[in-house]
Amino acid sequence: MATIDKHSYAHMFGPTIGDRVRLGDTDLWLEVEKDFTEYGEEVKFGGGKVIRDGMGQSQASCFDTPDLVITNVVILDHWGIIKADIGIKDGRIAIIGKAGNPDVQDNIDIEIGPGTEIIAGEGQIVTAGGIDAHIHFICPQQIDEALMSGVTTMIGGGTGPATGSNATTCTPGPWNTHKMLQATNDFPMNFGFLGKGNTSLPIALEEQIEAGVCGLKLHEDWGTTPASIDNCLSVAERYDVQIAIHTDTLNESGFVEDTLGAFKGRTIHTYHTEGAGGGHSPDIIRACGESNVLPSSTNPTRPYTINTIDEHLDMLMVCHHLDPAIPEDIAFADSRIRKESIAAEDIMHDLGAISMIASDSQAMGRVGEMITRTWQTAHKMKQQRGPLAPDTERNDNFRLKRYVAKYTINPAISHGISHEVGSIEIGKLADLVLWKPAFFGIKPAMIIKSGFIAAAPMGDANASIPTPQPVYYRPMFGAHGQAPANTSMTFMSQASLDAGVPDKIGLTRMVSACKNTRNIGKDDMIHNSWQPTIEVDAQTYEVRANGELLTCEPVTTLPLAQLYCLF
């Protein structure tokens, strides 16, 4: 068999087993664990290349071949880091393995035919589309920002720049819910809306769930009392939807112990569990040790830098309608911003005690930076804490799996949508993000919705080739016409689907019911299920996990930052 040198092979077909890839300008290194392609039998498209009639392409009917194959790509997901070809059929991942023509090649899993499109994945990394589970739907322009960053699913609440939506992730009531469902029908993004959960009687919650929300949100600005918590969770248990909560910063209606008691062991997603984004001061972070709590962070505290504290005070005053002329409002803001718990938050992410990261879009968070902030946190922790067992100095594979799970599979599990999205697995929607390694985590090379390209960097449309400047992110055909509705999904309660809500309000897009939200717990958070005993010193705000002080220094510089954002 003819061979080529390793450098030439990597340049032509991408890395293989044992090869390492640096992610962006971080200190994080990926190492390929398994390669499904076969040396000498790789498929590649182009003039004089393999995927031609009678060579790498068969004569098979379109019914028997994929609509799209991504060739020779490195998959980074919670379950592994492998190199493979990915076959996509009818908008879903059909098979992961070796592509080619079984007429002339052995051991072919994916048959390429005349009806198959090709995306060259050589030298690139593919991840599942990001899931941002803390969205304030304040303006529709957020959707483009999120999509271009690699997010393909947005879960949250809001009705636009209403005062309530600026502060709380709630879409209150059936009328507002229907309007938001209709408004988002034609966007190339998956959606799930959270209704307002703050009430002590069931009827208004039942109406919202039956109207089409995928869950409910309890927010302190609407009054997160023990009675409303108990009532909201009781309704959720009957309807199989998730509850998200922003707890009582001022401890007016109870302390963290009262809130944890009101949960009564029932599953709940705690937003910004460190507390800077809101929650019992100073010790809401204790919730990370509870088996029924699914904790997440929002990205403004990710990671802890020299600017984190200062910018939070200004953000808080605006987002929560506070008045700097009122001393009590200033005290409220000061009570939420604690450097000790923000430092501990970094370490708790690295140890898997906080399971998810989201944005808190335009309400103390940046919708286009969820993925970037996640990898910046991973980089900072490697710099400050070294390899994360069982990793060695050679690669960071386990750390990468832990962190990618925080914005893909774990929010999908938490909100009952992991049967449709959240990972690169057979049968799920082909919501995929391609990255060139040098731009990993900040500038995607392509965003694919259900197997169809929705967004990508693109050059001058009047140029003779696709690459001349100015190159910037633009919507592709998957973002136009009827394509978004046929490649994107809205997640709703089963009760609303049973009631025929999509047809009644004229939705034309795909819909799916969220499910299995009430029989899960922290143990189900992949690579992020640690449940330590958390203690917070009420005077110093120091955080300890199982007796060990959790602290780290803020950093002065970060990767995936100005170097990539000059224009």
Curated annotation (Swiss-Prot):
Subcellular location: Cytoplasm
Keyword list, A-Z: Cytoplasm, Hydrolase, Metal-binding, Nickel
Gene3D superfamilies for the chain: Metal-dependent hydrolases (3.20.20.140), Urease, subunit C, domain 1 (2.30.40.10)
GO molecular function, one term: nickel cation binding
Modification after translation (UniProt): Carboxylation allows a single lysine to coordinate two nickel ions.
Chain sites annotated for binding Ni(2+) 1: 134, 136, 217, 360
Active site: 320
Binding positions (Ni(2+) 2): 217, 246, 272
Source superkingdom: Bacteria
Binding site for substrate: 219
Assembly and oligomerization: Heterotrimer of UreA (gamma), UreB (beta) and UreC (alpha) subunits. Three heterotrimers associate to form the active enzyme.
NCBIfam families: PRK13206.1 (NF009685), PRK13207.1 (NF009686), urease_alph (TIGR01792)
Family recorded in the similarity comment: Belongs to the metallo-dependent hydrolases superfamily. Urease alpha subunit family.
Name by which UniProt lists this protein: Urease subunit alpha
Gene: ureC
